[in-house]
Amino acid sequence: MAREGKRIRAAREGLEPTKLYAIDEAIKLVKSKASAKFDETVEISMNLGVDPRHADQMVRGVCNLPNGSGRTVRVAVFARGAKADDAKAAGADIVGAEDLLEIVQGGKIEFDRCIATPDLMPLVGRLGKVLGPRGLMPNPKVGTVTMDVKGAVAAAKGGAVEFRVEKAGIIHAGVGKVSFDEQKLVENIKAFADAVAKAKPAGAKGTYIQRIAVTSTMGPGVKVEPSTVLTA
């Protein structure tokens, strides 16, 4: 614990805890403070002026990161026939119907994204208690219930990031790796923030995007001036 505390203190050196940094400067700091022996994920957190306990203040959506996420995404697809063939051709890791249902019911969930054709949603619905808590339940609002399984698989593999506001009004997501060029990280962050801004619910009142911070997996958080991230 003492060693970890020393590492964290060292990482925070040079950071002004109350300062709001421009996004370009914030990313430079995040990259310079990343000291783990693996390629850390760069993460964004956004505090929103919503109360997700109210249905008209729920924020949910998907963002296609222009430069990808840098992570390997394992994709499962519930489909039959030609659509199953499309999913396999697009690079889905596991494709099936009743057979895939049995695998998931057996507790074997070796995928990060789940896609389904509309006709198989009654089947997939049986897995609500398994997939729901893991954020894996297919949903038409984020493009994972679709007949275009080829496009959905390509998007998931290419860096599509789903987001959903948590109870405290916070959204967070991985938007790249510390090995990415600074400009690519900035572009990804701006794209993600723009997607969240466009997902503003009708019931949101007051300032919608209140605070933004970026960090790496093992690094300190860096507060960001929202106006340097938001395009509008």
Curated annotation (Swiss-Prot):
Gene3D superfamilies recorded: 3.30.190.20, 3.40.50.790
GO biological process: regulation of translation; translation
Transmembrane segments: none
UniProt keywords, alphabetically: Repressor, Ribonucleoprotein, Ribosomal protein, RNA-binding, rRNA-binding, Translation regulation, tRNA-binding
Single GO molecular function: tRNA binding
Cellular component per GO, a single term: cytosolic large ribosomal subunit
Pfam family, one: Ribosomal_L1
Matching InterPro entries: Ribosom_uL1_bac-type, Ribosomal_uL1, Ribosomal_uL1-like, Ribosomal_uL1/biogenesis, Ribosomal_uL1_3-a/b-sand, Ribosomal_uL1_CS
Family classification: Belongs to the universal ribosomal protein uL1 family.
Complex and partners: Part of the 50S ribosomal subunit.
Task performed by this protein: Binds directly to 23S rRNA. The L1 stalk is quite mobile in the ribosome, and is involved in E site tRNA release.
Name of the protein in question: Large ribosomal subunit protein uL1
Organism for this UniProt entry: Methylorubrum populi (strain ATCC BAA-705 / NCIMB 13946 / BJ001) (Methylobacterium populi)
